[in-house]
Amino acid sequence: MQIRYFLALSLLPQVVLADESPTASASQCVIEPPVPRIVSQPGLSAADQEKIRIVSDRSNAEMGKQAIFTGDVVFSQGDRHIAADEAILDQATEQFDANGNLVFQDSIFTVTADSLQAQMRSNRATLKGAQYWLHGQQVHGDAEKLQITMNNNLILTNTNFTTCPPDNVSWLLEAEKIKINSEEEWGEIWNAKLRVADIPVFYIPYMTVPVSDKRKTGFLYPSFSTSTTNGFEVSAPYYWNIAPEYDLTFTPNYMSSRGLFTKTEFRYLAGEAQSGRLNLEYLGNDQMISGSPNRYLYNWQHQGAIDKNWRVLANFTEVSDNNYFNDLKSDVNRATDNQLSRIGEVSYFERDWDISTRVQDIKVLGEDEKPYQVMPQVNFNYRAADFWNNLDFGFNSELTNFAHQDSDMNTATRLHMAPSLTLPIHGPSGSLTSQVKLMQTNYWQEKNNSGFDGLDDTVSRTIPQVRINGQINFERFTELFDQNYRQTLEPQFQYLYVGYEDQRGIGIYDTAQLQDDYFGLFRDRRFSGLDRIADANQVTLGVTTRFFDDHNQEATKFSLGQILYLQDSKLGYEDNLFEQNQSTSVLAAELDTRLSHDWYLGAAIQYDTNSSDNKKTEVTLDFRPEANKLLQLSYRYVPDLLNSNTNDLVNISQAGVRGAWPINDSLYFVGNWYYDLNESRSIETYTGFQYESCCYAIRLSYHYRIKTNYDDNIGSAVIDEREQFESGVYLNLVIKGLGGSGPLGVSDMLNDGLFNYRKPLYLRN
């Protein structure tokens, strides 16, 4: 005799477990059933696990007829048990009935019921007046009738479930019927009513929920907000699990001041090592802009590998207007992003060489001047280690065609080749790398604008380069502030020689000046791209010291360096702009340190010793006593920064405070505040409170930020002109146990703003 039909009961609690992830305090939320657990005999063999054992105070059985068991009846098979006051087994019809303090238990859950009727021949069973509890979890509920079909599917009639403690049921889902398909691993719910604080809040005639950890179609958690620019907002994402390799999320977002804003995200897997994403966003007839224009976004991203050698990459974004990200909360870019990437690349890799082809078109929002398009670029690189007498040979090359959307702009084709010989010498206490390189570049330029008279039709540029880079590592044990440390001292030097050639006949296609931080002092060029290769005859001196504690954790790292120019650089970026006519570069210093167990400091400064000017300063001070507690103070100063929107030089002097702190076990606070010291105004304020209990989580936040308003290139001016600042209130609610995206987190609150949270300590542990 088998009782395998009881196995289907183990599917029931999984209805409310889909997409749940245990939290640190999950053990405090476990709800135990009110009946004691029946303990299985340990050490049973596989054969004994299948045997059925029946124990009762009294029994009356006759072969081929009814067998009656009364008084503390216990049926056991492995770790599955049925306890009842009375049980009857009709051997002729193979019907099994049990009633009176009925309890079913296995390793997954416990079910109590008034009665059980089972047909062993068809594997059907019905439990009436059922209550269930999931072991080690918080899911529990009632059912007037629980039926097990011959296919091991479940049907619950007049049922409910919750994840709240029995003495404090904050929410309860009631349903007329729930059907669980064990093979498809999904559940259907009819006439569902959600009660919050015993008050019905909404009714759903039909819904589906997952019954396993597999992705499943259904609604995700809604969110609510209100802001000065969009009005009242409500969004209700819907997730569609199309196939194992495809899914789609559709989010209708209603904004009272603008209209219906829809967002669609389609994700896919292609083969074993490729994936991609397609985003479509649309707002029809934006009511905030005169003329009510349509606003849209489409974005496609794809990356992956084709067998072991081929790599593919694609990223394409288009928006309807300059202020799209500024006005609407997109899933693709942040409000501060003003560049759209359109890149496609195919690469092939071997051990010693690689080749790639790419096209690129960067769109800068709010700027009249458009960057050049790369249509296309072919790169070929070759590497030969220990090529001859310990010398490494390298060959880098590229062929690039520069196009432009404006037919009046000049265009060009560029061929660049750079063979090199490198002698690397590595030892236990240092290294020395010497390299000679010859850079040959040819340009074929088409002058479409007569205003550029200085442009040459063809250019052949040959520039030699010599680079010697060395580092020595010293180490000692020392004591500092009554603590033992292992200290390293790492002096580093670089000599760089780059020949000079007049490059004023070459247009600017992909070149910009690079920033000078500590690591930038040891680069071999001042500009990105290849349109300008600056001559150099210079020595870079730098030193880094580190302190490691007894656990070999890096507690402090300090770096200091500067370039000594042996002769002036003759080459500028455009005409004579940015020519290097000083004896030294900025003095760059960086510090990352753990001041104590809880305090961390990060700082970086670039100081011009020639003019005694501070060129850049960044400081962050963190207090992190525990993983979920944070207080950060920050300051940033950058003078003469080019504003790409106005082409004006501006000074940045900003101070900020960011914090995340638990008020108690359930209530969490996250906030930040950034202040512009030059303009004497707040540029961003974010305050959020999150409450999380065993069965629900709710987040209420307030956001005030400065807006980056560009000139409108759709419709007419914004009604009542664009606001310089935006403020809003946001509400998110998670009811644990109803599927969706799971509990709210604190990390996303830290990054929900113009300035992402960044740890100041980048130590090599």
From Swiss-Prot:
Residues 1-18 form the signal peptide. Pfam families: LptD, LptD_N. Transmembrane segments: none annotated. InterPro entries: LipoPS_assembly_LptD, LptD, LptD_C, OstA-like_N. GO terms for cellular component: cell outer membrane; transporter complex. Its main location: membrane. Keywords: Cell outer membrane, Membrane, Signal. GO terms for biological process: Gram-negative-bacterium-type cell outer membrane assembly; lipopolysaccharide transport. It is found in: Cell outer membrane. Together with LptE, is involved in the assembly of lipopolysaccharide (LPS) at the surface of the outer membrane. Belongs to the LptD family. NCBIfam families: PRK03761.1. Component of the lipopolysaccharide transport and assembly complex. Interacts with LptE and LptA. This is LPS-assembly protein LptD. It comes from Shewanella sp. (strain ANA-3). The lineage of its organism: Bacteria, Pseudomonadati, Pseudomonadota, Gammaproteobacteria, Alteromonadales.
